[in-house]
């Protein structure tokens, strides 16, 4: 059992419920049979608020196509035909700056957003594959990072198969890498 209690009486009933909810999550993270009092200056509260803010930003980025992939070229020592890229995820800020994944992926993991993020990455990568293929007229292979949480999604394989067909990308040109 866990118990979270806001200690400040200002704000609306919804504000108090959000504070109690935050305190409950912190108590739950601390282990069994814990209580936690909500204080605005509490480091755990500040960290939780930060994660919740990032989760909201990830949801906004998903809804508004505000993710971007950067291709990091991988060159084999012996050379060879074609191009091979690892696709690296970034979130685009309103000012155009790019946010590295370590800033927002922990919150996306905690709040169950990774399957949606992974699907967005797959779509972006396959679209990019087609554009690279047309621009280079060479074989193009891409490495796409997926979260471990997406493996439990029973519809992921069908989604990938449909996306490969939709973007006209041969399956052998895509390598999925699982992050820990």
Residue ranges and their predicted role:
Residues 6-7, 12-14, 19-22, 26-68, ...:
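C-di-GMP signaling machinery
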Residues 1-7, 162:
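GGDEF/GGEEF active-site signature
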Residues 35, 76, 81-86, 113-180:
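Catalytic core of bacterial c-di-GMP phosphodiesterases, primarily the EAL and HD-GYP domains
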């Amino acid at each position: 059992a866990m118990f979270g209690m806001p200690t400040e009486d200002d704000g609306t009933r919804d504000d108090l419920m959000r504070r109690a909810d935050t305190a409950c999550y912190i108590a739950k993270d601390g282990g069994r049979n814990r209580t936690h009092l909500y204080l605005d200056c509490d480091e755990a509260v500040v960290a939780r608020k930060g994660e919740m803010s990032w989760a909201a930003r990830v949801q906004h980025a998903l809804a508004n196509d505000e993710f971007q992939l950067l291709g990091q070229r991988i060159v084999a020592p012996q050379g060879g035909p074609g191009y091979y890229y690892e696709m690296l995820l970034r979130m685009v800020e309103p000012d155009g700056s790019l946010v590295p994944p370590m800033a927002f992926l922990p919150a996306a993991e905690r709040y169950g957003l990774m399957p949606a993020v992974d699907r967005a990455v797959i779509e972006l990568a396959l679209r990019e594959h087609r554009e690279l293929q047309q621009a280079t007229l060479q074989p193009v292979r891409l490495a796409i990072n997926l979260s471990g949480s997406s493996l439990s999604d029973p519809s992921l394989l069908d989604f990938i198969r449909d996306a490969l067909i939709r973007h006209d990308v041969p399956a052998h040109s895509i390598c999925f890498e699982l992050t820990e």
